[in-house]
């Protein structure tokens, strides 16, 4: 069983039940899914950029990403409806816990000048979003094999009703929040 899932069952659930007064362990908030997205703006001029971003995302998450297409045309960006402009992966279950473990323990500590993630990036409904400026913080990505440095958006969707519950859940799982 994944390390974080075991930690959730053995440590997080009892701590959350005690702090928030849940009567039933099934009422304790849990992580539902993690969505990782890479926006590839240069795909308008260079269609090969999408494949490179998809390859990087597949290596990082262990799952084949879906190509996202533009919903409407925007003349200023030379963008037409239906053009590929990004790649996204939705992780659930074991892969989700494996990715979260990798993010917390391997990737975030490798970010330059890292002092913790912002505690203000919750959306008001218990979901947390963070952005990474480069994919090189993940140990699977080799510097010589990439064509250019790309950032990514990571959204952690929880079943928590409030931001306070979600923050406590992520903090107990080891997410390094700024003090």
From Swiss-Prot:
InterPro entries cross-referenced by the UniProt entry: Ribosomal_uL5 (IPR002132), Ribosomal_uL5_bac-type (IPR020930), Ribosomal_uL5_C (IPR031309), Ribosomal_uL5_dom_sf (IPR022803), Ribosomal_uL5_N (IPR031310)
Provenance organism: Dictyoglomus thermophilum (strain ATCC 35947 / DSM 3960 / H-6-12)
GO molecular function, one term: structural constituent of ribosome
Family indicated by similarity: Belongs to the universal ribosomal protein uL5 family.
Gene (UniProt): rplE
Stated name of the protein: Large ribosomal subunit protein uL5
Disulphide bond pairs: none
Assembly with partners or alone: Part of the 50S ribosomal subunit; part of the 5S rRNA/L5/L18/L25 subcomplex. Contacts the 5S rRNA and the P site tRNA. Forms a bridge to the 30S subunit in the 70S ribosome.
Biological processes per GO annotation: translation
